[in-house]
């Protein structure tokens, strides 16, 4: 009986993983986005965080929607996808345009995404207090450093249910001080624990040992941005060819739980 129960349990886990795999293979994802799977490792990353399709999951600042096109369909039938995004009436033109672009994307993909919940990426909670099973942040933390990191971490903590998971990835610095897009992994762990989170562990699935982190324009010289910032105009093509071979940045992948 125990063996049978274990077998059924393994089958259910397998089916759950296959469901996420189906989303990743789906035609609604662009070939350009699928090509980045080798660097962003969405299946392994989300499985490390422990995502389930019946969860309420908040994604912070989805940006261009790379993870949104995975999370929203995956959670469509049994769970709830929540996007914490910029304000429509922000003083920043960039943020207003970002909001408009995301609302258009959600509308254009309604059949695939279902009915995502839109909340403000501001204040001391994202949506309702203790409403989320999981809050995810993909490459946002470097924008918070020195400005609002404690405010954001506190809002994440307030949003999660007890036992809820905070999963985060970002560009990893080899030093404490780095103003070129890379962030201090042990500093983040320290700050999250100070807020009240329990640190569960790290995965190296998004590590990249080829990333030397010494680029004139910072992490943005690497793919996918391939910024020309800081590069000599005469050597842009040569350097970008080099950066493409390096691939996307070296990133930490951390998991925390709200007790």
Name each region found by the language model:
Residues 163-175:
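Conserved beta-strand signature within the Rossmann-like core of class I S-adenosyl-L-methionine
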Residues 72, 149-162:
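A short glycine-rich, Lys/Arg-flanked "PGG" loop and its adjoining helix->strand segment in the class I
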Residues 53-63:
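Conserved class I S-adenosyl-L-methionine
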Residues 239-259:
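C-terminal lobe and adjacent flexible extensions of AdoMet/dcAdoMet transferase-like proteins
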Residues 125-135:
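A short acidic, Gly/Pro-enriched loop at the edge of an enzyme's catalytic core
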Residues 54, 77-78, 160-166:
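Short glycine-dipeptide loop
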Residues 20-53:
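Class I SAM-dependent methyltransferase Rossmann-like catalytic core
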Residues 179-203:
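Conserved Class I S-adenosyl-L-methionine
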């Amino acid at each position: 009986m125990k063996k049978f129960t274990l077998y059924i349990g393994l089958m259910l886990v397998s089916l759950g993983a296959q469901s996420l795999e189906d989303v990743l293979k789906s035609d609604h994802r662009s070939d350009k986005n699928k090509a980045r799977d080798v660097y962003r490792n969405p299946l392994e990353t989300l499985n490390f965080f422990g995502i389930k399709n019946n969860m309420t999951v908040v994604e912070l600042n989805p940006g261009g929607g790379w993870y949104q096109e995975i999370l929203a369909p995956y959670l469509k039938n049994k769970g709830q996808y929540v996007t914490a995004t910029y304000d429509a009436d922000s003083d920043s033109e960039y943020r207003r345009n970002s909001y408009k672009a995301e609302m258009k994307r959600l509308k254009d993909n309604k059949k695939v995404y279902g009915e995502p919940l839109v909340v403000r990426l501001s204040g001391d909670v994202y949506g309702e207090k203790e409403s989320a099973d999981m809050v995810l942040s993909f490459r946002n933390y470097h924008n918070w450093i020195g400005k609002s990191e404690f405010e954001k971490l506190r809002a994440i903590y307030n949003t999660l249910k007890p036992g809820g998971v905070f999963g985060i990835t970002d560009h990893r610095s080899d030093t404490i001080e780095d103003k070129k897009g890379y962030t201090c992994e042990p500093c983040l762990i320290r700050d999250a624990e100070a807020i009240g989170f329990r640190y569960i562990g790290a995965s190296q699935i998004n590590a990249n040992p080829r990333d030397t982190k010494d680029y004139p324009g910072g992490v943005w010289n690497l793919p996918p941005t391939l910024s020309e910032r800081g590069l000599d105009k005469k050597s842009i093509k040569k350097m970008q060819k080099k950066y493409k071979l390096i691939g996307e940045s070296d990133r930490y992948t951390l998991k925390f739980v709200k007790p």
